[in-house]
């Protein structure tokens, strides 16, 4: 009876002890109501102590019975014996890696003591697992139903934390949805997406469910993860559900973007009101200021080169975005005339636009003079005749000048002129030490189209602002043979005299990009934008650098470096030995055998070039061996910025236009969600590595484009090339990780390749007789039914029709656009 009473008391205390962390010793007095109090005698228990620990932790109990000759440990009235987890000492009991089965009533007993000879511990090993990502442990204690609780249907334990139903998060972030619940018996939870069961294969990269915390976790979310997520909690007595809505926001780290043409110049009279408007677009919260420029001692700038400005208006706590975007100047005076700047900044950088305020004197009321009516009418007629005569003379002179300059158009009747201004995608900076040659205002390409009634073909002209740092005289440029052409442009070899400023009298072989005769206004805008992109990126050894441009008095010429050995894919294929599948020109085979170190060097140089582009906030989007050029000294240079975009452009990360896409080089998030990041370039770099170590092999050989989509979703990757080490193949597979955030950065790739290149030796010649195309031989080497380029490189975007994007190839050292 005595032991049974202790067990009932222990069960009652364990029911009350549903806590998540071990607390200091809690003393509970047990009162015997069936008999009066007596002095402590033998076989009388001391006050029990309550302990609570987590699973996996160390349970350590110390028997406080001092002076005992012998101590015996028991659990639930059964003797404890040492084993691989249990250590029983004289006055210590230690259990490692505790589990819920270790919960119970522990006692240590001794003989020969005056006060008491049994001391008890009530141990509760909770089944809640702590996590720094979820709520604290005291909240989790309510998620577990106690054994003594009455049967009931599920209920939410923290409904106040589930009130936020709409969650909008940036792409590539981690999302957690929690539905903490309880019930007796303990309910089960399952998740639905858009009212359908949510399975692991429904999402690229899968998801995690932490049942102990009632939590759904999705890493690196993409736009396809948008939808309604419902947690359904149920037991045999009923069910409850709660729905969260997830919206994945496309965001790109960029400084504020100001709308072109705002603020505009304003002209008012003295006493009138002036108003400037500045439209700011920024993902991160921008800070906006209005500045007024002034002069001091006749100078507009200080000794440090910075302009003198005073802050007129700044964003504050009580200021809305629409209020700060408008500068209102009431009752202006002549002192208010001058330059005003709208300055916007965020954590990424700052941008600004400037406008001028012109103040004219107020109009005075004309003095009324009583002229005879006849004289007023005569004056009006004379002035009208004079103005008409002036207009006729001006028109005749202008037509004569136009005819003298362009005799081809003089014979064409009824010529109509349509003028259009196209803003360039050019970066704006306020840094005093910036190396950019671009001014603060966005330059415009002014395109004039002449259309004659006798000829249907438009004749485009353009007016591009001259950039002194890059302008090159046409007289010093001698065009040579064509190197290639594409959808809208062509590339020719040329000799540029004095383009190397260190050797002003020496001619340098260059490549010149230009438009074809049937190019459109969009083609011109694309070529100018590519030129501006190359200006912004700057110079690096492992990219094709801009050397100059001819923008005045003639067609637009973009002058770039010339690579004599063509593109990397043809360079590798031409050095294959006889007998391999690719047909090659024997006359182009190099006498120098390729070594393993040569291939690692190619990979290392391309990684360095991509590391530099990433540091300049530029994403290539079309990295492949066909877009890497090889110079005479075997230097790898990344080319083809036709698809490249600066991440400061707000519409860059998600491709909204349609056209031809290099699907076999594209990362899954770019292929399926059209999300482009530096990590999607890393995926393409892994495919380029595979091309290098197969000596110009075609990725996924024999796999149709339609089948490729399915294989990528199922996690299939290309096999290890024959000429590749296990370490380099693991590097490729790291680049092909399904979750973009788990891929290495270009900086890490450069460090690893530098180490491998240092350890490689020139004597490691390649076994070039091994087969190159070894992936999935069950598929015949057939082309996709979709229109594609070489080796099924490109696939049409099925969303809409659009002329093909520029695709560059290289023939005999040239660039094919």
UniProtKB/Swiss-Prot annotation:
Coiled-coil intervals: none
Subcellular compartments: Cell membrane; Golgi apparatus; Cytoplasmic vesicle
Active site: 622 (proton acceptor)
Glycosylation sites: 32, 84, 124, 228, 265, 297, 318, 331
GO biological process, one term: determination of heart left/right asymmetry
Residue ranges that the UniProt entry lists as topological domain Cytoplasmic: 399-817
GO molecular function: ATP binding; fibroblast growth factor binding; fibroblast growth factor receptor activity
Reaction equations catalysed: L-tyrosyl-[protein] + ATP = O-phospho-L-tyrosyl-[protein] + ADP + H(+)
Location of Phosphotyrosine modifications: 462, 582, 652-653, 765
Signal peptide: 1-22
Disulfide bonds, paired cysteine numbers: 63-108, 179-231, 278-342
UniProtKB keywords: Apoptosis, ATP-binding, Cell membrane, Cytoplasmic vesicle, Disulfide bond, Glycoprotein, Golgi apparatus, Immunoglobulin domain, Kinase, Membrane, Nucleotide-binding, Phosphoprotein, Receptor, Repeat, Signal, Transferase, Transmembrane, Transmembrane helix, Tyrosine-protein kinase, Ubl conjugation
Membrane topology: Single-pass type I membrane protein
Family, per entry: Belongs to the protein kinase superfamily. Tyr protein kinase family. Fibroblast growth factor receptor subfamily.
Protein name: Fibroblast growth factor receptor 2
Record organism: Danio rerio (Zebrafish)
Name of the gene encoding the protein in the UniProt record: fgfr2
């Amino acid at each position: 009876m005595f032991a049974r009473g202790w067990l009932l008391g222990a069960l009652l205390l364990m029911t009350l002890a549903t806590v998540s962390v071990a607390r200091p010793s809690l003393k509970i007095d047990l009162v015997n109501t069936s008999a009066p109090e007596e002095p402590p005698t033998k076989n009388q228990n001391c006050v029990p102590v309550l302990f609570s620990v987590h699973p996996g932790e160390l349970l350590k109990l110390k028997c406080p019975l001092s002076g005992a000759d012998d101590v015996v440990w028991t659990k639930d009235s059964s003797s404890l014996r040492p084993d691989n987890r249990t250590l029983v000492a004289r006055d210590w009991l230690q259990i490692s890696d505790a589990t819920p089965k270790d919960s119970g009533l522990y006692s240590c007993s001794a003989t020969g003591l005056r006060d008491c000879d049994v001391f008890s511990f009530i141990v509760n090993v909770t089944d809640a697992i702590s996590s720094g990502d979820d709520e604290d442990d005291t909240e989790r204690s309510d998620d577990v139903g106690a054994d003594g609780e009455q049967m009931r249907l599920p209920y939410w334990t923290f409904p106040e934390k589930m009130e936020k139903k709409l969650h909008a998060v940036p792409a590539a972030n981690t999302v957690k949805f929690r539905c903490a619940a309880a019930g007796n018996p303990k309910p089960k939870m399952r998740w639905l997406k858009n009212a359908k069961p949510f399975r692991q294969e429904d999402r690229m990269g899968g998801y995690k469910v932490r049942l102990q915390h009632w939590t759904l976790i999705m890493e690196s979310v993409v736009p396809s993860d948008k939808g309604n997520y419902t947690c359904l909690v149920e037991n045999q007595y009923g069910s409850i559900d709660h729905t969260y809505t997830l919206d994945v926001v496309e965001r790109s780290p960029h400084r504020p973007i100001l709308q072109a043409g705002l603020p505009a110049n304003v002209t008012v009279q003295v006493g009138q009101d002036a108003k400037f408007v500045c439209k700011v677009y920024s993902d991160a919260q921008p800070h906006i200021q209005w500045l007024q420029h002034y002069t001091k001692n006749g100078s507009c700038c200080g000794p440090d080169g910075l302009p003198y400005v005073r802050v007129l208006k700044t964003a504050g706590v009580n200021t809305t975005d629409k209020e700060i975007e408008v500068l209102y100047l009431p009752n202006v005076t002549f002192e208010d005339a001058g330059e005003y700047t709208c300055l916007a900044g965020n954590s990424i950088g700052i941008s600004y636009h400037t406008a001028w305020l012109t103040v004219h004197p107020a109009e005075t009321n004309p003095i009324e003079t009583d002229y005879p009516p006849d004289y007023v009418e005569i004056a009006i007629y004379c002035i009208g005749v004079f103005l008409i005569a002036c207009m006729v003379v001006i028109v005749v002179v202008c037509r004569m000048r136009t005819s003298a300059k362009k005799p081809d158009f003089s014979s064409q009747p009824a010529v109509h002129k349509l003028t259009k201004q196209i803003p360039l995608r050019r970066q704006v900076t306020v840094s005093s030490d910036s190396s950019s040659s671009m001014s603060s205002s966005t330059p415009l390409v002014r395109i004039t189209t002449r259309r004659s009634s006798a000829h249907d073909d438009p004749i485009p002209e353009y007016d591009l602002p001259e950039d002194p740092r890059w302008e090159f005289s046409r007289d010093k440029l001698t065009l040579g043979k064509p190197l290639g052409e594409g959808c809208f442009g062509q590339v020719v070899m040329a000799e540029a005299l004095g383009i190397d400023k260190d050797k002003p009298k020496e001619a340098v072989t260059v490549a010149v990009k230009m438009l074809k005769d049937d190019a459109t206004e969009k083609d011109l805008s694309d070529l100018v934008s590519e030129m501006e992109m190359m200006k912004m990126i700057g110079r690096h050894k492992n990219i094709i650098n801009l050397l100059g441009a001819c923008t005045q008095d003639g067609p637009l010429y973009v002058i770039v470096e010339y690579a004599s050995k063509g593109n990397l894919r043809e360079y590798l294929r031409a050095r294959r030995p006889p007998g391999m599948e690719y047909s090659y020109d024997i006359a182009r085979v190099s006498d120098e055998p390729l070594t393993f170190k040569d291939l690692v060097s190619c990979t290392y140089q391309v990684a360095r070039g991509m590391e530099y582009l990433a540091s300049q906030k530029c994403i290539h989007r079309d990295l492949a061996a066909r877009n890497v050029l090889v110079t005479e000294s075997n230097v790898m240079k990344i080319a083809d910025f036709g698809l490249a975009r600066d991440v400061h452009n707000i519409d860059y990360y998600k491709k909204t236009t349609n056209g031809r896409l290099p699907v076999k080089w594209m990362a899954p998030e770019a292929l399926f969600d059209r999300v482009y990041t530096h990590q999607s370039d890393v995926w393409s770099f892994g495919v380029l590595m595979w091309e290098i170590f197969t000596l110009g092999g075609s990725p996924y050989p024999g796999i149709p484009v339609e089948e490729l989509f399915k294989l990528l979703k199922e996690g299939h990757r290309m096999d290890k090339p024959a000429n590749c080490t296990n370490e380099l193949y693991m590097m490729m597979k790291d680049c092909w990780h399904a979750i973009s955030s788990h891929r290495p950065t270009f900086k890490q790739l450069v460090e690893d390749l530098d180490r491998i290149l240092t350890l490689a030796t020139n004597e490691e010649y390649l076994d070039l007789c091994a087969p190159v195309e070894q992936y999935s031989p069950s598929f015949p080497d057939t082309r996709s039914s979709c229109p594609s380029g070489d080796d099924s490189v490109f696939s049409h975007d099925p969303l809409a029709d659009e002329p093909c994007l520029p695709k560059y190839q290289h023939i005999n050292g040239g660039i094919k656009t």
